[in-house]
Amino acid sequence: MKTQYPKLQTIELEKGFIELLEGNIILLKFKEDGVFELRDAIEANKAIYSAVKGKPFLSLVDARVYGSISAGAREFFAKDTLTKEIKIAEAIVINTLPARLYAKFYIRLSKSANPVKIFSDIHDAKLWLQLQQKSMFGEVLERDIRFHDKFKNN
């Protein structure tokens, strides 16, 4: 499966970056050592919606580099309907225990109708997102099902 996605568009935010990648993937990356507040989450969601032009997308959150995220921002990301309704699936990439705890809390808070999964490897996260998109649109092949076994547990 192809895991390299060229950047189609990059939007710089005050405390992060939104990258539109091929394959309907939106990558949210945080800038180092900042506190991602509610206003930053609102700005990010508006930028995401604008980048995808209101069409379904796959969300890839790279939380390997970040300062912290406020409770208001976490709750906003979990419950805001602007992008939640068009998000096919979401993969969160982490590399620290605090980030894993934040991600697990976010998953419980969001009660998403769409799949959300935590990863430590960004390539695995992209492959999983690709599989979720194929599942949604009925394009899953037998080799994809074997591949899916790798991701049954977090």
Locate the predicted segments by residue.
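Amphipathic, Lys/Arg-enriched alpha-helical "gate/interface" segment within cytosolic domains
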Residues: 1-154
